[in-house]
Structures are given as structure tokens and as C-alpha cells.
């Protein structure tokens, strides 16, 4: 199914590039972005990153840049480079605050780090885990405000841990 979706996206993207009015620079940026998405969907992360970075060099539109930055964050997150992932998610959000998926992914990283810290069972790590859980909650609440029907697992965790009230 993924291969069909990738091919469909490529065909639609090619048609859009031909029929929509766009500058040469916009078309170039979109071509890099499209190549990055294709490589990313096939797990070729180095190639995807290269294309995304090329897209950022020529893309001027903040909205379009936000999705490129978001996808770079996805790759870093998928490869365990969480500090870089957080950096790119935050950059994406600075250009486009309406990215609940970036907020969710930030929360997932903080939640995962909190669980890891909690498992160490030393006082300093217990406090760190509480801070990280609170950060995860903060980002999940923001994501749920933008996309109330998404992230049911996050909503449940927030309710169970007492971090979600009727005011959130």
C-alpha cells in the first residue's frame, strides 16, 4: 500500500508542478521536497535529509519550510537523534504553530525520556522524570487543542495522571 501511495503522490505532484503557476525557485524547492518524501518513505534517510536540506536552501515560504523542517525532525526522531528532532520540531512550530503532529512528537520524546529516567529509580532521576512528564503533558495539551479528535492515547494518559482538566 505504501508504494501505491508514494507513486500516487508522485504523479499528483508532477501534475501540480505543471499546471499550477509557480516560480522556478518554488518548483525547485518542491522537487527537492518531493524527492525527500519519496526517499523517506523508502527508509533512505540520508538521501531524504540531503533533499530536505536542499529544499530549505531555496524555499522561502514559511509554511512550506515548516513541513520540510517537520520531516527532518521525523527522520532524526526515527533514527534516535532526539535532541536534533526536538530542534527541528521547534523550528517548524516557530514558522507554523498549527502543527499538532509536531507537538505530539515532542510530547512523545519527552514522555519516552521520562520513562527512561524513571526506570533509574534514583532521587535525581525521579525528579527529572516528573519534569519530563510535565513537559510531555504540556505539549500533548497543545496538540489536543489543535486536533481534539486525535491522540486518544495521549488524552487518556493526561486524564489518568490528572494532567487534563476541563479547562485544558
Swiss-Prot record:
Q: Where in the cell is it found?
A: Plastid, Chloroplast thylakoid membrane
Q: How does it sit in the membrane?
A: Peripheral membrane protein
Q: Which residues cross the membrane?
A: none
What's in the GO CC field?
chloroplast thylakoid membrane
Keyword annotations from UniProtKB, A to Z = Chloroplast, Membrane, Photosynthesis, Plastid, Repeat, Thylakoid, TPR repeat
Report the principal subcellular site: plastid
TPR repeats at which positions? 29-62, 66-99, 117-150
One Gene Ontology BP term is: photosynthesis
State the family it belongs to: Belongs to the Ycf3 family.
According to its UniProt entry, the function of this protein is described as: Essential for the assembly of the photosystem I (PSI) complex. May act as a chaperone-like factor to guide the assembly of the PSI subunits.
Q: What is the name of the protein in this document?
A: Photosystem I assembly protein Ycf3
Instruction: Please name the source species.
Output: Phaeodactylum tricornutum (strain CCAP 1055/1)
